[in-house]
């Protein structure tokens, strides 16, 4: 698989094969600028490579139109973006429940588990925040960076997507918040059986994963299959 930003000659991902099994939890490490976020964006269908194959939950993203990729991502992928990508004028609850507005599958999963989408969102948020800390009706623009990161995490987990993609999901969290997030993440993985791709510079939780993949190896790989 070949990919370059703005058709530059410096290819971020190049030649080989990467396969992640269903239910596997993979910790991806690498130096800054090694292409970790780019790889996650390719796997998540945010960008497409100039050449190669990216097969996710039975779909070759390279063969799908943009709207088709959006549909697969909405139904099957929970993405914790490095920049969070929250909608600032929506409330905390509205941001967390947003995936269930775009995906009937995730909406049905949330309702089956918790009785309603709101109850599912409240459960996730109460695992990440001290109960009663503040109203979840506040807009996300009122939150600190660390608080926003927790909202982004809850949004990715709601509705039990088959694949969780986490790009530096604890970078802005203090120790207690980081431990609360990791506890919730692995509880949700145990419940849903989701596959996890997790990028971080922090090796503290590396031992929790089935496998550690280094970008120095991944950069020699061409096909991605999950």
Where are these regions (language model features)?
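Helix-to-loop junction immediately C-terminal to a conserved catalytic motif
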Residues: 44
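Hydrophobic anchor residue at the start of the ABC signature
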Residues: 153
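Conserved catalytic motifs of ABC-family nucleotide-binding domains
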Residues: 160
